[in-house]
């Protein structure tokens, strides 16, 4: 009987305080032809950590695209309000990115591959519906630290839709 009560209390506490989110960046998918998936886990009501993975599907010759072909971004968010539906947050992130950068050598244009790591910050806002629907938008920038072949700045822009469970 004690085990049953313990299991029921654990299940009810998990449902009462949803701590996990899965999201898809719809702006990237529609505008830039890339897929960015994110997972976020709450440490407290005011802080969370997560990871997002960006896969660029646009061709290298496309004028409007991210420089990065692939980017994995672990992040930490601090929420400045404890409102249950609308939250404003600040984010620190580390972006591990790789792609191709266009260069000119001896009057020839070529693409040079790179892999680099960026540190950056972002700000944003999140809406949480009572049923678990999540909509968040954020904007930020990071700076690549290690490679001389990589772009200096890395954008962090998104409009996500997802589910809290």
Set out the residue ranges of the language-model regions.
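Sec-dependent N-terminal signal peptides
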Residues: 3-13
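Gram-negative (and chloroplast) outer-membrane scaffold detector with strong preference
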Residues: 40-137
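Sec/Tat signal peptide C-region and signal peptidase I cleavage site
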Residues: 14-18
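Positively charged n-region of N-terminal signal peptides that target proteins for export
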Residues: 1-4, 19
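Outer-membrane beta-barrel "beta-signal"
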Residues: 153-165
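Solvent-exposed loop/turn segments connecting transmembrane beta-strands
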Residues: 23-36, 60-67, 84, 145-154
């Amino acid at each position: 009987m004690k085990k049953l009560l313990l299991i029921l209390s654990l299940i009810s506490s998990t449902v009462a305080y949803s701590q996990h989110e899965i999201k898809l960046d719809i702006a990237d998918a529609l505008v830039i032809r890339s897929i960015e998936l994110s997972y976020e886990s709450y440490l407290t009501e005011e802080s969370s950590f997560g990871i997002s993975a960006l896969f660029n599907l646009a061709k290298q010759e496309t004028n409007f695209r991210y420089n990065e072909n692939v980017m994995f971004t672990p992040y930490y968010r601090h929420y400045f309000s404890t409102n249950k539906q609308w939250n404003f947050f600040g984010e620190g992130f580390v972006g591990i990115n790789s792609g191709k950068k266009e260069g000119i050598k001896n009057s020839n244009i070529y693409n040079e591959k790179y892999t680099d790591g960026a540190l950056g910050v972002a700000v944003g806002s999140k809406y949480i519906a009572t049923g678990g629907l999540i909509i968040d938008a954020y904007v930020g920038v990071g700076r690549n630290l290690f490679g001389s072949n990589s772009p200096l700045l890395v954008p962090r822009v998104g409009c996500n839709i997802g589910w809290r469970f």
